[in-house]
Amino acid sequence: EGTLAVITKCLLRLVPKPEASLSVLVPYADLKTGIQSVLTILRANANPTAVEFMERKVVALGERFCGVSYPRPDAGSYILLTFDGRSEEVTANAARVRSLALQNGALDFIELSDARQCADIWRVRGALVKAVEAVSEQEPVDIVVPISRTADFIRFINDLEAQSGMQMVSFGHAGDGNVH
C-alpha cells in the first residue's frame, strides 16, 4: 500500500490452490505482547499467509458494526493468522505457532475450524476501517513501519492518545508492518 514508488522489476510466482487452509485467533492480554509474539512466529518459518493484529477497542467497534462477537472479550488484543498449503504442512505450522504463542503470553489459541465462526471473525476484521469511519470524523490512515518497530509505534500512538485525549485505535497487517 502506498503512493510513492518506482517499479523497476516485477516477478510473479504462481502457486497452486492450497489443499488446506486454517485460520486461528490468538488473544493476548495486551497489544505489546501480541506484537512481540508475532516477531517470534515470523522467525519460526511457520509461513502464515495472513498475520493481522487488532486492539480490543477496535474489535469492539467491529463487533458492534457487524453484530458479531469475538471469543475472549477479556483480551486486550488479538492476532489473526491463516495457514495455507498441504494438510500436513498446515497442521504442523499451526501446532508450531500454537506452542510459540502460548509460550509468549497468548491467553488462548482458537482454531477457527467452524466455517461460520471463521467467516464471522474475518468479516469483523474486514469491516474495521468502515467501523472506525462510522464513529470518527477522521479518515483512517495507513502507516508502514519496520515489523520489528511495530510495538514501539503502537506504544507511541497509545501515549499520544493519553496526552491528547483523542481516541486512537490500532490494527493492521502484522506480517508487513502496515498499521491502520
Per-segment meaning from a language model:
Residues 1-180:
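Noncatalytic alpha-helical scaffold of FAD-dependent oxidoreductases
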